[in-house]
């Protein structure tokens, strides 16, 4: 046990943190550049939200204007390559407003990105994080490969409540990845298999064709099955119980015809029974060959230059809080940082919100009861007033 603890300590000590932002004070505005690409971007403000433990520790930057684009980014202290290393992107998101449509993701870019002109078309290495609009609740993991942005093929569902959640992306040097939400694994896999980064290893043989005599019909009509002679019956017949109305005038109304009814003897279209096809060979499978366009890439994970991170978002309803942004080469460092930030907040935040929700529910219930009592009292007053009016009328 002692050796394991020592290994963990060594791993954290040797870890390199390329970027860390906790938004503990107003100095964040000096580090995060407001894009000037357009003049009506929404404004971020410093806030811990409604429910927190330690305000200075738990505060982050919050979107503050509805129906706005947001664009703000920061440079790392130094640019780096993740060659031969693990890369971890981690941060927290709280959709305190009960978001209906809006992004909560980050874009991690090269160091030469022009942050003053940061916008939706600015190239990036990785885009990661939650995106919600209507029923769609997805964690984006988009990798830029040879100038093209490639979406992950797997569905990862994000959190959509009003609490803080921790999102972690781990890119490994063996071309594998892991997405964690609140410290729990949400998806793992291979970069090659879960993104369309490379051409397919195999393709259908263009020279292969299904033989003309290949029979894929598992069942066929029984040639010996014969339609019964009494099968053909009309679908509808005249109603035998119908009688011409006594006042029916053939000259005025035309020749009377009884209404039609469903024929109880109608059997529908006759079809011969099905039997096993003796010539059935199964479904023909197109043979595959090695794809001459495929070339393996052992460095799908690799980006030679990392140097900036930014929020480029659209939100219909503002109120999302971002905090505890971390870029490191160590999973252990990311876990340690989460333990000092997210883990200390989540329990207290949940308890305070549940208490506030319960108090709000009680207030709402009391208001409902009061409204019902007032409605009932008014009904009694109206009935009493009506009764008095009737008694006065009787006396007259």
Swiss-Prot record:
Keyword Disulfide bond (UniProt): yes
InterPro entries, A to Z: Calret/calnex, Calret/calnex_CS, Calreticulin, Calreticulin/calnexin_P_dom_sf, ConA-like_dom_sf
Cell location: Endoplasmic reticulum lumen
Biased composition regions of type Acidic residues, renumbered to the chain: 213-224, 381-396
Gene Ontology cellular-component terms listed: endoplasmic reticulum lumen; endoplasmic reticulum membrane
Alphabetical list of PROSITE patterns matching this protein: CALRETICULIN_1, CALRETICULIN_2, CALRETICULIN_REPEAT, ER_TARGET
Motif, Prevents secretion from ER: chain positions: 393-396
Signal sequence bounds: 1-15
GO molecular function term, any single one: carbohydrate binding
Region (Disordered), start-end ranges: 202-250, 342-396
Repeat positions for Sequence: 186-197, 205-216, 222-233, 239-250, 254-264, 268-278, 282-292
Region (C-domain): 302-396
GO biological process: defecation; determination of adult lifespan; endoplasmic reticulum calcium ion homeostasis; ERAD pathway; hemidesmosome assembly; IRE1-mediated unfolded protein response; programmed cell death; protein folding
Record flagged with keyword Zinc: yes
Cysteine-cysteine disulfides: 101-133
Keywords from the named record: Calcium, Chaperone, Disulfide bond, Endoplasmic reticulum, Lectin, Metal-binding, Repeat, Signal, Zinc
Sequence ranges of Basic and acidic residues compositional bias: 202-212, 225-246, 342-380
Span list, region 4 X approximate repeats: 186-250
Location of the region described as P-domain in the Swiss-Prot/TrEMBL record: 193-301
Domain of life, per lineage: Eukaryota
Annotated positions binding an alpha-D-glucoside: 105, 107, 124, 131, 312
Domain notes: Can be divided into a N-terminal globular domain, a proline-rich P-domain forming an elongated arm-like structure and a C-terminal acidic domain. The P-domain binds one molecule of calcium with high affinity, whereas the acidic C-domain binds multiple calcium ions with low affinity. The interaction with glycans occurs through a binding site in the globular lectin domain.
Family: Belongs to the calreticulin family.
UniProt-listed PANTHER family: CALRETICULIN, CALRETICULIN AND CALNEXIN
Role according to the record: Molecular calcium-binding chaperone promoting folding, oligomeric assembly and quality control in the ER via the calreticulin/calnexin cycle. This lectin may interact transiently with almost all of the monoglucosylated glycoproteins that are synthesized in the ER. Probably by controlling the folding of extracellular matrix protein unc-52/Perlecan, may play a role in the formation of fibrous organelles, a hemidesmosome-like structure attaching muscles to the epidermis. Protects dopaminergic neurons against oxidative stress-induced neurodegeneration.
Protein name stated in the entry: Calreticulin
Organism name: Caenorhabditis briggsae
